[in-house]
Amino acid sequence: MRPDTSDFRELFLSGVAMLDVRAPLEFARGAFPGAVNLPLMDDAERHEVGLCYAQKGQQAAIELGHELVSGQRKAARIAAWAEFARAHPDGYLYCFRGGLRSQLVQQWLRDAGVDYPRVSGGYKAMRGFLIETIDTAAATQPWFVVGGLTGSGKTDVLADVPASIDLEGHARHRGSAFGRRALPQPPQIDFENALAIDVLHHLDAGWRALVVEDEGRFIGSRDVPQALSQRMQASPLVWLEAPFNARVERVLRDYVQGLAAEFIDTKGSAEGFAAYATRLREAMAAIAPRLGGARYGKLAALLDQALARQAESGEVALHRGWIEVLLRDYYDPMYDYQRAQREARIVFRGDRDAVTDWLLAHTARQGE
């Protein structure tokens, strides 16, 4: 039998399958990418056992747990765990603290002829390791931050630089009022866990520096871990430049054509387009107080005209109208001001090819 493990680094780097035996509610609050939830107790059973523990102590709670999970219910759960173990012979199981629940699952599997190791310390210890990974990387690793005006292609640059961490990808949000995607953002803990595992892989790869896109503390409603956010605000800034027309086309691609495709893929043609149109209108309305009444009215009318044409014929050209005004009169002045405030941090500026080449040269592994 393989031994239990507390080598969290190897667990996450290897990407082995993990069987989470916590209750569904615990799993929904935060989990690791790819982990499978096959609980020892469902939410109601866990609640009953928890009340019993508080009122009568541990032994009574254990006895109640055995009573609740017995007979066919117990047999079905053991069968599901055994099937997982056979499908993932290199995997591990865990509960919240690596205590009674995972030990019991391990024993029941052993009684059924299946030896399967568990993670010592459970979810709590692994979660602590991931938090420490981000904090340590923020404190000790060199970072570069890619900035630029809206539509300059910062995310495209990240895709070309292997040492980059895609915060917006992990947050499932493009980081502005118009940044919401068709699918909801992951829970905060899931965002942090996936981000930390990504950072761990990048540290293991040996890059001389890591690269992120310029972000505020929040990406949508997801909170960038404080240590990383503070490090980003103090790190060298690489400024990406792009012509205005190219930026308009990139916004059209990502925030109009791409977003419409996401919604249609998720909800179907008619319902998806309606949800996409609603999302754009909501985004415009969200910045109405900062636009002012007259400018908001103009932009909302341009957006409505563009959506009507798109619904009728699929043509997206009219969207350029509101995009151009929004960039020129709203986003560009805002980001120009922010850039001026941080001018001293800019260590390089250039177009996509120049910025990509510079980042590749300054993040390459030692000896490359």
Curated annotation (Swiss-Prot):
Gene3D superfamilies hit by this protein: Rhodanese-like domain
EC number: 2.9.1.3
GO biological process: tRNA wobble uridine modification
Positions of the Rhodanese domain: 12-135
The keyword Transferase appears for this protein: yes
Record field: catalytic activity: 5-methylaminomethyl-2-thiouridine(34) in tRNA + selenophosphate + (2E)-geranyl diphosphate + H2O + H(+) = 5-methylaminomethyl-2-selenouridine(34) in tRNA + (2E)-thiogeraniol + phosphate + diphosphate; 5-methylaminomethyl-2-thiouridine(34) in tRNA + (2E)-geranyl diphosphate = 5-methylaminomethyl-S-(2E)-geranyl-thiouridine(34) in tRNA + diphosphate; 5-methylaminomethyl-S-(2E)-geranyl-thiouridine(34) in tRNA + selenophosphate + H(+) = 5-methylaminomethyl-2-(Se-phospho)selenouridine(34) in tRNA + (2E)-thiogeraniol; 5-methylaminomethyl-2-(Se-phospho)selenouridine(34) in tRNA + H2O = 5-methylaminomethyl-2-selenouridine(34) in tRNA + phosphate
Keywords, in A-Z order: Selenium, Transferase
Subunit structure: Monomer.
Function: Involved in the post-transcriptional modification of the uridine at the wobble position (U34) of tRNA(Lys), tRNA(Glu) and tRNA(Gln). Catalyzes the conversion of 2-thiouridine (S2U-RNA) to 2-selenouridine (Se2U-RNA). Acts in a two-step process involving geranylation of 2-thiouridine (S2U) to S-geranyl-2-thiouridine (geS2U) and subsequent selenation of the latter derivative to 2-selenouridine (Se2U) in the tRNA chain.
Name of the protein in question: tRNA 2-selenouridine synthase
Organism: Cupriavidus taiwanensis (strain DSM 17343 / BCRC 17206 / CCUG 44338 / CIP 107171 / LMG 19424 / R1) (Ralstonia taiwanensis (strain LMG 19424))
Gene name of this polypeptide: selU
